[in-house]
Amino acid sequence: MWQAFKNAFKIPELRDRIIFTFLALIVFRMGIYIPVPGLNLEAWGEIFRRIAETAGVAGILSFYDVFTGGALSRFSVFTMSVTPYITASIILQLLASVMPSLKEMLREGEEGRKKFAKYTRRLTLLIGGFQAFFVSFSLARSNPDMVAPGVNVLQFTVLSTMSMLAGTMFLLWLGERITEKGIGNGISILIFAGIVARYPSYIRQAYLGGLNLLEWIFLIAVALITIFGIILVQQAERRITIQYARRVTGRRVYGGASTYLPIKVNQGGVIPIIFASAIVSIPSAIASITNNETLKNLFRAGGFLYLLIYGLLVFFFTYFYSVVIFDPREISENIRKYGGYIPGLRPGRSTEQYLHRVLNRVTFIGAVFLVVIALLPYLVQGAIKVNVWIGGTSALIAVGVALDIIQQMETHMVMRHYEGFIKKGKIRGRR
């Protein structure tokens, strides 16, 4: 492993990419400590701790604070991080599955992807502006102590909205530069850095919680099993053999090759969990606004009804998103169009039904896995009775991005005849 890292720095291009990525991440981490203008930082720290202890929103705040790398707890210019961009990307991907014009745009090659990326940035600006205004205004209005002396709520809202929106767009630009000049996907790297930066605070929470030896062993075992399970499921796929018919033109023979169609167990990544988290938080938000104690207790984070609805939503969205990004009808049509077929099946309807059946079976495993990952923090907290946010979702993102980084570094090193991180086999990057 250490020899592989040494080899990586022997390749000038790879060394420059690694250094650029580290410098970009330093800039990202510095920005997290810059508060928005007009904020009473000390008062906000007390307010955040008080809100985080509220039964209905504790899990939601912890989940979001992990994604922002702790920026929310500091109410910094990077408070929204790249979440508006992720939301915009998901919305446009879903629209592309039902709007022929967007679907055709994605099929136009590089130019189409550039146009799609431009639409994503515009939607990010719109969503980011609305989100920044809503967060700034609602928090300042309900907690006027967080506003610095001499600044009214309206002034703070304007300053905070502009600062957070500028922070999001800067991170979007920084992520694109990392993709272009660094290692891995820039947006994923920023989220990865934010998640990993929170791990020391998790360990500190566990230490201050006074865990005994047995509870420490349980906590470490859960973490190791979770990481192993994530790697296993992230890499798992069902391969369907595709055979292409041979064509003879003159003295040349075309086709006749055999390949495979991969169907990943976890097609949607963390997107089903993000969708489910957004929906399941609505009753808690309504309860907080209306101050309805019955609704607060009913949909308390970690309560039976909350976990039941959360789990069912994750299960549903896993199937829903799998069908969106892997359309059996479209794929069977493409196989037939290019002269391919699945051995033992007729092209067309039979192939489509077979792909649909395999997709359902494979997705079931992925859906059960994501439900366990989503509910893991609440199950661990219930077992050891300590408020330690061991997030399966954050681990899923961190491990996925780490695998992608290793795969890219491996490719650079193998191309230049250096021994990589893996001596046998090959890690597949996320698609």
Swiss-Prot record:
GO biological process, one term: SRP-dependent cotranslational protein targeting to membrane, translocation
Cytoplasmic compartment segments: 1-17, 96-120, 179-182, 227-270, 316-367, 404-431
Membrane spanning residue stretches: 18-32, 74-95, 121-133, 162-178, 183-198, 214-226, 271-283, 303-315, 368-382, 390-403
MF-aspect GO terms: protein transmembrane transporter activity; signal sequence binding
PROSITE patterns from the UniProt entry: SECY_1, SECY_2
UniProt cross-references to InterPro entries, sorted A to Z: SecY, SecY/SEC61-alpha, SecY_CS, SecY_dom_sf
Topological relation to the membrane, as annotated: Multi-pass membrane protein
Keywords assigned by UniProt, alphabetized: Cell inner membrane, Cell membrane, Membrane, Protein transport, Translocation, Transmembrane, Transmembrane helix, Transport
Sequence ranges marked intramembrane in UniProt: 74-77, 78-84, 85-95
Function (record text): The central subunit of the protein translocation channel SecYEG. Consists of two halves formed by TMs 1-5 and 6-10. These two domains form a lateral gate at the front which open onto the bilayer between TMs 2 and 7, and are clamped together by SecE at the back. The channel is closed by both a pore ring composed of hydrophobic SecY resides and a short helix (helix 2A) on the extracellular side of the membrane which forms a plug. The plug probably moves laterally to allow the channel to open. The ring and the pore may move independently.
Similarity remark: Belongs to the SecY/SEC61-alpha family.
Quaternary context: Component of the Sec protein translocase complex. Heterotrimer consisting of SecY, SecE and SecG subunits. The heterotrimers can form oligomers, although 1 heterotrimer is thought to be able to translocate proteins. Interacts with the ribosome. Interacts with SecDF, and other proteins may be involved. Interacts with SecA.
Protein name: Protein translocase subunit SecY
Origin organism lineage: Bacteria, Thermotogati, Thermotogota, Thermotogae, Thermotogales
The gene coding this protein: secY
